[in-house]
């Protein structure tokens, strides 16, 4: 339902104002009420004035340009702690002016240095007047001049202990003496190559081999694995070198390592030169006397009976006979050992082929 309210102002005596309500019900406009009402002449129809809000004047204070107060510089003495430190000395203005003028004439950096110079030069007169002088307890005489140390004894002891901790061994200087020999061994293999001195009792073959080997290299015996145990690899055996007990490390890293080809060639040449000529025996009717001689001392002599038609034995020397006998027996034993290994290998191969 829509309601239409219509106000009509009627001019007349009573100045009545009628309100007409027009109601539309189902599309029909009807006038329901029409009632007059009195208008109060004292009431003004003018718009009411808006209330004025009180104005508050808020003025922001400008930021203060002055920050926190600066820390005042300390006027205390910053030198060695002595009796009387930090105390001001009051003197007449004429004395202060004379000291200031003397500082400029002497070229000192401060007035305190000038006062110290005055005390040092006036020390004889002070001693004559007082009997003791103005020498403090911590002052020292260096080349006839009194010196006051700027560091305490505790600081100097700490510095000395620190230097001692840094040093690995006793030293009388800050530098390392290259020519100084190290008394204790480090336990590591040396880098530089060293030469060994063979004693005169060493064998001739080992001497020749050591002389022909490259410097810094040592011979090694490679022993192959047994044919019966194929899983075990070959291992190397380093021969015992005769010499004094203070020899350097056996295995040394050469500074300039030689090539393997030169090492193999040197070993082959050494073995060729160390092998003596074969023994030549001429049959005779008597017996052959073979002696084992080491150097010039006769150790033992063995007699072997052998049928022969001539009376003579042709040998180079007794030492060559001993060496030849040793090599002959060694070659013979090695040959037997090789035959045994070959026989075992052949039997193993035959057994495997028969099983398959």
Swiss-Prot record:
Q: Which GO terms describe its cellular component?
A: nucleus
InterPro entries from the entry? TF_TCP_subgr, Transcription_factor_TCP
Highest taxon in the source lineage: Eukaryota
Presence of the UniProt keyword Transcription regulation in the record: yes
Query: How is the quaternary structure described?
Result: Interacts with SPL.
Task: Give the TCP domain ranges.
Answer: 75-129
Q: In which tissues is it expressed?
A: Expressed in archespores, pollen mother cell, ovule primordia and megaspore mother cells.
Q: Region annotation Disordered: residue ranges? A: 57-85, 151-171, 302-322
Q: Which UniProt keywords apply?
A: DNA-binding, Nucleus, Transcription, Transcription regulation
Source taxonomy lineage? Eukaryota, Viridiplantae, Streptophyta, Embryophyta, Tracheophyta
Q: Which GO terms describe its biological process?
A: negative regulation of leaf senescence; regulation of cell size; regulation of DNA-templated transcription; root development
Q: Where is the composition biased (Low complexity)?
A: 308-322
Tell me what this protein is called: Transcription factor TCP9
